[in-house]
From Swiss-Prot:
It comes from Synoicum turgens (Colonial ascidian). Disulfide bonds join 7-31, 11-27, 16-24. The lineage of its organism: Eukaryota, Metazoa, Chordata, Tunicata, Ascidiacea. Keywords: Amidation, Antimicrobial, Disulfide bond, Oxidation, Secreted. This is Turgencin-B. The modification Methionine sulfoxide is found at residues 5, 9. Oxidation likely reduces antimicrobial activity against Gram-positive bacteria and Gram-negative bacteria. It is found in: Secreted.
Length: 35
């Protein structure tokens, strides 16, 4: 849903940009849980 999309964008601009890897995956997995 839209929440998941916005959450993924936030992940991409923060966690994924800074470190990536497992932390990025975890962030996006949390987004998926939001649906």
């Amino acid at each position: 849903g839209i929440k998941e999309m916005l959450c993924n964008m936030a992940c991409a601009q923060t966690v994924c940009k800074k470190s990536g890897g497992p932390l990025c995956d975890t962030c996006q997995a949390a987004c998926k849980a939001l649906g």
